[in-house]
């Protein structure tokens, strides 16, 4: 925090009182409570957000490595982390996995590895088809939010189809 802002920030316990406006962030569920609690005050309430990547198969290795940074930073927990890929029909994931290998050391983090093992087991026990490189699973799924150590993907026929979908789902991304 910038030092000049210290005098403007107050931490309180209990019920908030004497404030003019609210900025809050949290899950979609938490946002419902914020909206109710702060209904009489001007507010900016941010809900869950997910980031997506639209691939067309012409990406360079360097671009895919950059995508890996966007997937793995903060273990995938940030709102700007890519949790969903849109790929053309018959997309070959070989180049994608080759680029992701640059982040293979992430599996050395115990909590990440536990999430990887758990989510992979849940997916396999549910008979989902997975692509796996021993530290990241990718699963075909229409959802935007994927669990830690996994990325969802969806095939597309045309970029216009993806553009339309992203416009329609703008409140989620």
Segments from the language model and where they lie:
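Structured loop/turn residues at beta-strand edges in well-structured enzyme cores
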Residues: 17, 80, 168
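Conserved acidic residues
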Residues: 20, 83, 171-172
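N-terminal Rossmann-like or analogous alpha/beta NTP/dinucleotide-binding catalytic cores
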Residues: 21, 29
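Short beta-strand segments
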Residues: 23-25, 45-46
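Long, low-complexity C-terminal extensions of enzymes
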Residues: 143-173
